[in-house]
């Protein structure tokens, strides 16, 4: 017989200030979740108990660094809920320090820890903001360690909303493989568990008729399929993942992000992500993300 907890799904959203938590929370609200922002950790378990009593099916909760003194309670609270059979997913939104500084500078909003940082620093306003961001990283390190990280440094708000919805739609007890293409020239994704460098493979960019296309287009796919090194790289990545995915699933990992990088994030990495998602789609839940094809700055709300 199922308990009442079996019908309750909880998504906890934490992360860096300015990383897009409000965008993610709005996405879940649109998906039918009952959403609460800035819930103090002390009220987390009582709030969940209340939702069980009301037979709420799906709840999304956002917490941030303003309750830093109580955040160490959260990992144990999540473990308690999981032991009760509650479906829990924890998402941590992140971005590079430079990206967060730019977002705050553009909107002229104040970081929630900026006062604490500036009290102990004679440096200018930008330095105080960087200090606040780095302090926040330290305070949230444990939450980041135990969550699925989403790097929002280069992503449109609409794409972030769609990505969050796709993540929460997967079964919580099953490992989900996220394949992500990216360009090394724009940095390695901060949410990657494994990174494969494919810049040594033949580059369609130097074929004039393929330059403006992407790895999702048939002419590019046909070109890369004919390259022996591309087939060998695909085989080696497939073997590596097949070797370790079972162990990761047994370790109760909910998500594993595999990032494939080339120079521009347009041809080779995109093609390999498409192929890997196809190869692993029968055995695992798979999601695809092409960072550079979706790239656009995210702004604060």
From Swiss-Prot:
Q: Which SUPFAM superfamilies match?
A: P-loop containing nucleoside triphosphate hydrolases
Matching Pfam families: PapZ_C (PF22740), RapZ-like_N (PF03668)
Keyword annotations of the record? ATP-binding, GTP-binding, Nucleotide-binding
Q: Which residues cross the membrane?
A: none
Taxonomy, superkingdom: Bacteria
- GO-annotated molecular function: ATP binding; GTP binding
| Binding sites annotated in the UniProt record for ATP | 15-22
Q: Which InterPro entries match?
A: P-loop_NTPase, RapZ-like, RapZ-like_N, RapZ_C
Q: PANTHER family, from UniProt?
A: RNASE ADAPTER PROTEIN RAPZ (PTHR30448:SF0)
**Family affiliation:** Belongs to the RapZ-like family.
What exactly does this protein do?
Displays ATPase and GTPase activities.
Q: Which HAMAP family match?
A: RapZ_like
Q: What is this protein called?
A: Nucleotide-binding protein Rfer_1653
Q: What organism is listed for this UniProt entry?
A: Albidiferax ferrireducens (strain ATCC BAA-621 / DSM 15236 / T118)
